[in-house]
Amino acid sequence: MTIDPRHKSHNLLDGPGRAPARAMLKAVGFTDADLERPLIGVANTWIEVMPCNFHLRRLSERVKAGIRAAGGTPIEYNTIAVSDGISMGTEGMKASLISREVIADSIELVARGHLFDGVVALSGCDKTIPGTVMALCRLNVPSLMIYGGSIMPGQFQGHDVTIQDVFEAVGKHAAGTMTNAELKDLEDHACPGPGACGGQFTANTMAIAFEFLGISPMGRNGVPAMDARKDDVAFECGKLVMDLLKKDIRPKQIITRRSIENAIAAVATTGGSTNAVLHLLAVAREMGVRLSIDDFDKINRKVPLLADLKPGGRFTAADLYAAGGTTLVAKRLIDAKILHPDQITVTGRTIGEEAKAATEKPDQQVLRPLSKPIKPTGGLVILKGNLAPEGCVVKVAGHSILHFSGPAKVYEREEDAFKAVQAGKIKAGDVVVIRYEGPSGGPGMREMLGVTAAIVGAGLGDSVALLTDGRFSGATHGLMAGHVAPEAIKGGPIAAVKTGDIITFDITKRRLDVNVTQKELAARLKKVKHPSPRYLSGVMGKYARHVSSASEGAVT
């Protein structure tokens, strides 16, 4: 493929006046022939601090080979990544959600600065997936995202295990039901190699969502990280971006209100992570699509929960792939007349056309038939009430609690709540409240997996509820309300809750309330003394000053 005047790189490379640019590119190995072809950015999120992204260098080489085979010149560059699983429960976790914005900004800046004609983004860990797609939305050049794939399950005492089991084992160990030796054995075997966390946690949730959004080729993200076919997928994606360039298909033609609704439906039917609400709101904003937190509840009301996936179910993402994968999920939802089948994807085919290729493993138990759903409605609900005027998100996949009332145990930060659980201070019937962990108040809206897993590990998963203006990991299960908005630091009612107040979750009525009058809440809020900002400078301080509410996607 020769340079077409439509291609941005024409302005970077052509003519005598661009000799300095060509000279610098030749210094790193590019030839005249290379520079006559379209330049395709390969935005990698490789990092060696975690298994999720550790193998992406291998995949990027195959992506680049595919680009070359189709007549393009790949230029690889890297951005940052922060491991949720490693930083969980520490001050470091505050960097996680903030990294989504930095990932998007950095991918965008490099691509704009070097006038790339197209981009392939490689992602793995939680925030790299939405971060890469947000960048592609902004750039609006022919582009796609490829997910590195799920880790395979580990083995412990004859059972499949994931990182979720290790977090919950910490609670069991504290409760005295797991020995030091057992914890060490589990630690050593839970994560057998590269790939993202294995359940329907945030990474796999967003990988599926973005196939249904159309920005990743259907059925390809689900190929596990160490499956030999993943290299073929990467090569195919390299060729595919050149096809998108030839046809001039761009994200704005793919990502629409209807494709976002398809993505929400995919999250709903697979029991996906609450983080999908934040990330899809953010993507919608990048594309100028009107989307509210209430839209998630409307769609979840009409979508059946079909996938029996961890953390609330029995199976892993690798099991779903073996059962038939996302094309089978798409077929189920099209048969139910839930999806918009006419939405185009990066393959150039519609999601309806992709679903026609679905196959199903005989006797598979991972994805239920429409006639026998796990639940008649989806895995997420949005609650509002005097504690969450702008809303909050509850994951109902994996539990059947529809009503819960109990006295509040209030903590100003995650670490204090974790210590209380470890010390046995949380009892059956309690409602744990963790505040000042929101987007601005944290800052960074930490995930509370350390606390929620400790609660489950202590045997209190069905008898204790939790609410926070922070987030939850996709590995969280039990009655947990996150993203409570407005957040405490912005004067949200959660700041006025006192230990002993009775808090009620009513899933059926979609309500979250504290048994205090509006007059009393208002009086309390006037007397609240918010903690001083924890960060005044650097990226944390800047984020705290500019980030929006969780109900708007926590964007900057």
Label each residue range with its predicted role.
Residues 1-54, 59-80, 85-86, 91-96, ...:
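Catalytic or ion-coupling anion/metal-binding cores of large enzyme and transporter domains
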Residues 96-105:
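Glycine-rich, highly charged phosphate/nucleotide-binding loops
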Residues 111-132, 144-147:
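A short, small-residue-rich loop immediately preceding and capping a beta-strand
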